[in-house]
UniProtKB/Swiss-Prot annotation:
Residue ranges of the TM segments: 39-59, 70-90
Primary role: Inclusion membrane protein probably involved in early modification events of the chlamydial inclusion.
Residue stretches in coiled coil: none
Source species, domain of life: Bacteria
Compartments where located: Secreted; Host vacuole, Host pathogen-containing vacuole, Host pathogen-containing vacuole membrane
Topology versus the membrane: Multi-pass membrane protein
InterPro entries the UniProt entry points to: IncF (IPR035119)
GO cellular component: extracellular region; host cell membrane; pathogen-containing vacuole membrane
This protein's name: Inclusion membrane protein F
Keywords, ordered alphabetically: Host membrane, Membrane, Secreted, Transmembrane, Transmembrane helix, Virulence
Length: 104
Protein backbone atom coordinates (compact mmCIF):
# COMPACT_ATOMS: atom_id res chain seq x y z
CA UNK A 1 0.00 0.00 0.00
CA UNK A 2 1.14 3.50 -0.70
CA UNK A 3 1.50 6.37 1.65
CA UNK A 4 -1.65 8.11 2.76
CA UNK A 5 -1.67 11.76 1.83
CA UNK A 6 -4.05 14.08 3.60
CA UNK A 7 -5.22 17.00 1.52
CA UNK A 8 -6.46 20.05 3.40
CA UNK A 9 -9.06 22.29 1.84
CA UNK A 10 -10.02 25.65 3.31
CA UNK A 11 -13.76 26.31 3.14
CA UNK A 12 -15.57 29.63 2.90
CA UNK A 13 -16.16 29.67 6.65
CA UNK A 14 -12.43 29.43 7.28
CA UNK A 15 -12.51 25.84 8.55
CA UNK A 16 -10.00 23.35 7.19
CA UNK A 17 -11.36 20.03 6.00
CA UNK A 18 -9.08 17.05 5.50
CA UNK A 19 -9.44 14.20 3.04
CA UNK A 20 -7.31 11.08 2.68
CA UNK A 21 -5.94 10.49 -0.76
CA UNK A 22 -6.09 6.71 -1.37
CA UNK A 23 -9.67 5.93 -0.36
CA UNK A 24 -10.39 3.79 -3.40
CA UNK A 25 -7.27 1.64 -3.23
CA UNK A 26 -7.81 -1.73 -4.93
CA UNK A 27 -6.16 -3.60 -2.06
CA UNK A 28 -8.59 -2.16 0.47
CA UNK A 29 -11.58 -2.98 -1.72
CA UNK A 30 -10.41 -6.55 -2.29
CA UNK A 31 -9.72 -7.00 1.42
CA UNK A 32 -13.18 -5.77 2.35
CA UNK A 33 -14.82 -8.03 -0.25
CA UNK A 34 -12.88 -11.05 1.05
CA UNK A 35 -14.08 -10.37 4.58
CA UNK A 36 -17.67 -9.97 3.43
CA UNK A 37 -17.43 -13.23 1.45
CA UNK A 38 -16.19 -15.08 4.55
CA UNK A 39 -19.13 -13.77 6.55
CA UNK A 40 -21.62 -14.76 3.84
CA UNK A 41 -20.19 -18.29 3.66
CA UNK A 42 -20.24 -18.62 7.46
CA UNK A 43 -23.83 -17.40 7.62
CA UNK A 44 -24.90 -19.81 4.86
CA UNK A 45 -23.17 -22.69 6.66
CA UNK A 46 -24.87 -21.67 9.89
CA UNK A 47 -28.34 -21.70 8.31
CA UNK A 48 -27.88 -24.88 6.26
CA UNK A 49 -26.26 -26.89 9.04
CA UNK A 50 -28.86 -25.72 11.53
CA UNK A 51 -31.65 -26.86 9.22
CA UNK A 52 -29.94 -30.20 8.56
CA UNK A 53 -29.43 -30.75 12.29
CA UNK A 54 -33.12 -30.06 13.03
CA UNK A 55 -34.29 -32.35 10.21
CA UNK A 56 -31.94 -35.09 11.41
CA UNK A 57 -33.25 -34.80 14.95
CA UNK A 58 -36.84 -35.00 13.69
CA UNK A 59 -36.02 -38.12 11.65
CA UNK A 60 -34.28 -39.62 14.67
CA UNK A 61 -37.28 -38.96 16.93
CA UNK A 62 -39.74 -40.37 14.38
CA UNK A 63 -37.58 -43.46 13.91
CA UNK A 64 -37.45 -43.15 10.13
CA UNK A 65 -33.79 -44.17 9.77
CA UNK A 66 -31.23 -46.25 11.69
CA UNK A 67 -29.95 -44.54 14.82
CA UNK A 68 -26.17 -44.98 14.33
CA UNK A 69 -25.54 -43.09 11.08
CA UNK A 70 -28.13 -40.46 11.91
CA UNK A 71 -26.57 -39.78 15.31
CA UNK A 72 -23.21 -39.20 13.59
CA UNK A 73 -24.92 -36.85 11.11
CA UNK A 74 -26.54 -34.91 13.95
CA UNK A 75 -23.19 -34.63 15.76
CA UNK A 76 -21.29 -33.43 12.69
CA UNK A 77 -23.92 -30.89 11.66
CA UNK A 78 -24.10 -29.60 15.22
CA UNK A 79 -20.31 -29.24 15.31
CA UNK A 80 -20.32 -27.42 11.96
CA UNK A 81 -23.18 -25.20 13.18
CA UNK A 82 -21.19 -24.26 16.28
CA UNK A 83 -18.06 -23.60 14.19
CA UNK A 84 -19.94 -21.23 11.87
CA UNK A 85 -21.54 -19.56 14.89
CA UNK A 86 -18.07 -18.98 16.38
CA UNK A 87 -16.86 -17.41 13.12
CA UNK A 88 -19.83 -15.04 13.10
CA UNK A 89 -19.40 -14.26 16.81
CA UNK A 90 -15.71 -13.40 16.31
CA UNK A 91 -16.63 -11.18 13.35
CA UNK A 92 -19.34 -9.49 15.42
CA UNK A 93 -16.82 -8.71 18.18
CA UNK A 94 -14.64 -6.97 15.57
CA UNK A 95 -17.35 -4.69 14.21
CA UNK A 96 -14.88 -2.04 13.10
CA UNK A 97 -13.44 -4.13 10.28
CA UNK A 98 -15.54 -2.42 7.60
CA UNK A 99 -14.64 1.03 8.88
CA UNK A 100 -10.96 0.08 9.03
CA UNK A 101 -10.94 -0.85 5.33
CA UNK A 102 -12.28 2.50 4.15
CA UNK A 103 -10.74 5.41 6.02
CA UNK A 104 -12.15 8.28 4.01
Amino acid sequence: MGDVMIQSVKTESGLVEGHRGICDSLGRVVGALAKVAKLVVALAALVLNGALCVLSLVALCVGATPVGPLAVLVATTLASFLCAACVLFIAAKDRGWIASTNKC
